[in-house]
């Protein structure tokens, strides 16, 4: 903080007409504040892949809200969030998650205990909050995000992002709440503005052009087109990633499947022999 105060003192004594010097000082101040914020990080969740972790400046940061977007009727975004939660359990076997959703908010139906167990996660880690009213749902997410004993809080926000004024107001509140508890905040839904959020992801299902070799996988693992749209202090990233439920790790798509395509192209071109593989989602 001494450096920040020294920079502010220098700005006071810089002549108004010397715009170049003032701009340099502002730039120096912004960089120093950014370094302080990054140093304030208490926990990061590695995504197993050096290139993705580098784009995230180390990993997914705890104590901040993150946005995970997907297409309607595509469970990939939900599957990606569950994969992140599974990795949190690897770090903390006693992890507790609060999942806030309205019946109409889900991208692909409602999450069930049986579905969570099928993903390889014990439902005992979850507390579910069902709330019909969108504003009450956001309030529940904020309150849960302030709870220090919670590892992560997830909210399926439905149509809340369609009100930009309310959306930005809630994002500011979520950011303060997450900083209070140090928990991961995960907002799950359709494409929404990312201002004020730590990261924005866009996750869609993809399809194998041929079945994975049995010697490599006993089943077809989730294959996702993962796009890191924005990351504070990081950079954009996009790649086809496989979620291996056995090792509980993200992996790059093997070379023999590099021609795999987004699942939506399969649906749009179902009659074409070039798109014959079955889609794999969450």
Predicted regions and their residues:
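Conserved RecA-like P-loop NTPase ATPase core
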Residues: 52, 68, 126, 153, ...
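Conserved inter-motif catalytic segment of the P-loop NTP-binding fold
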Residues: 93-152, 156-162
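Detector for small/aliphatic-rich hydrophobic stretches
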Residues: 1-99, 119-124, 272-282
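Localized chelating/binding microdomains
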Residues: 72-75, 90-93, 103, 117-118, ...
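Helical mechanochemical/support elements of P-loop NTPase systems and associated helical scaffolds
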Residues: 48, 77, 108, 137, ...
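C-terminal regions of RecA-like/P-loop NTPase motor modules
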Residues: 1-19, 24, 209-211, 232-282
């Amino acid at each position: 903080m001494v450096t920040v105060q020294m920079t502010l003192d220098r700005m006071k004594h810089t002549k108004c007409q010397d715009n170049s010097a003032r701009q340099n000082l502002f730039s120096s101040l912004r960089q120093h504040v950014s370094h302080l914020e990054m140093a304030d990080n208490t926990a990061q969740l590695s995504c197993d892949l050096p290139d993705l972790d580098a784009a995230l400046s180390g990993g997914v940061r705890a104590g901040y809200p993150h946005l995970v977007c997907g297409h309607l009727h595509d469970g990939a975004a939900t599957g990606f969030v569950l994969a992140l939660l599974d990795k949190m359990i690897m770090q903390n076997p006693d992890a507790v998650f609060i999942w806030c959703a309205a019946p109409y908010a889900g991208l692909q139906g409602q999450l069930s205990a049986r579905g969570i167990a099928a993903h390889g996660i014990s439902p005992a880690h979850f507390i579910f909050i069902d709330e019909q009213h969108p504003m009450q749902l956001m309030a529940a997410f904020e309150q849960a995000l302030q709870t220090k004993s919670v590892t992560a809080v997830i909210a399926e926000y439905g149509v809340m992002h369609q009100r930009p004024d309310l959306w930005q107001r809630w994002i500011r509140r979520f950011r303060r709440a997450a900083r209070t508890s140090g928990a991961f905040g995960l907002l799950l839904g359709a494409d929404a503005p990312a201002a004020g959020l730590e990261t924005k992801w866009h996750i869609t299902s993809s399809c194998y052009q041929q079945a994975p070799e049995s010697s490599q996988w006993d089943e077809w693992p989730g294959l996702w087109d993962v796009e890191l749209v924005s990351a504070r202090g990081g950079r954009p990233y996009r790649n086809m990633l496989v979620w291996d439920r056995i090792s509980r790790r993200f992996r790059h798509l093997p070379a023999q499947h590099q021609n795999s395509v987004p699942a939506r192209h399969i649906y749009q071109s179902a009659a074409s022999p070039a798109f014959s593989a079955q889609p794999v989602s969450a």
